[in-house]
Amino acid sequence: MGVVRPMNGILVINKPTGISSHDCVNIVRRAMNTKKVGHAGTLDVEASGVLVLGINKGTKLLNYLNQDDKTYRFDVVFGVTTDTLDHAGTIIDEQPLQSEPDIDAVLPSFIGKYRQTPPNYSAVKVSGKKLYEYAREGKPVPTVDPRELTVHELYRTTPVSMTDNRAYCSFHLRASKGIYVRQLASDLAAKLGTVAHTSAIHRIGAGDFTINEAINLDHVNANTSVMTLSDALRSMPYRTVSGDELFKAKHGQPLYFSGEATQLKILDERGKLVAIYEQKDTDYRAKNVFA
């Protein structure tokens, strides 16, 4: 993996539970002594795992990186639910289970297109106000239209265990961006005729980035190396340019390439990211210039 100092790139963090994604951004700003830090793909406060951060010019890549699928491991308790749909909330309903629910029978119904209504405790905004703000104030939470998502993989990773008329098990999920794992667990329980909440959510992947390359937040400091801009876009097709084409790329002028890629990262002969171009009609136009 290429690294660079001073920092212009991507940092993959293993977010701990108990803090927000924005808290992570502030911690990294202080630790790396830089103001320009952003994140792609918000993680719940009570969730942990992969959080992709852009450092300085790396913030320009976040919109591209946030389009990718996300992968999770999560634990669910069936038979009891909370107002937040996770273990940190207040219990609002209990439906003791008399037998082990047939979870595997309903999992296939979630694969493919899946319409999900965001939970009341979410950062979705209505009239400039987040849904969780309405909920915390005890006000009626506005109705939000369901969103169409895609679930690529959903399966159980542990046996179902029964204790005190509740069922416990863990799952693997790979889905499109924007999914609320807490709500998925609740929807899964509804198909089984019961209620549920998540007891743990751990994001193990975001696009090409995995938990194995994530750094613990408390290990970040001013000397921490970051992933280069080009390496961060590891799946994006590229063209290496020089001479007149390099001049045009640095100045955001149209470029002409054969091929069908809708997006291209433009590199100089040293492999440094110069720009990102998008196909438009018969040529490619600059979307972001980094040179």
Please place each PLM-identified region on the residue numbering:
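Pseudouridine synthase
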Residues: S127-K130, A135, A167-N212
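Extended alpha-helical targeting/anchoring segments
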Residues: S122, V126-V151
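Residue-level signal for inorganic ion chemistry
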Residues: L53, F74, G128, L184, ...
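Acidic, low-complexity central loop/insert segments
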Residues: Y64-P118
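Structural signature of FAD isoalloxazine-binding scaffolds in flavoprotein oxidoreductases
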Residues: N63-F78, V141-R156
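The conserved catalytic core of RNA pseudouridine synthases
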Residues: R30-T34, V52, P142-G193
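Accessory RNA 3′-end/elbow-binding domains used by RNA modification enzymes
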Residues: G2-P16, S20-H39, L43, A47, ...
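Short, charged/polar surface micro-motifs in flexible loops or helix N-caps
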Residues: N56-T59, V80-T81
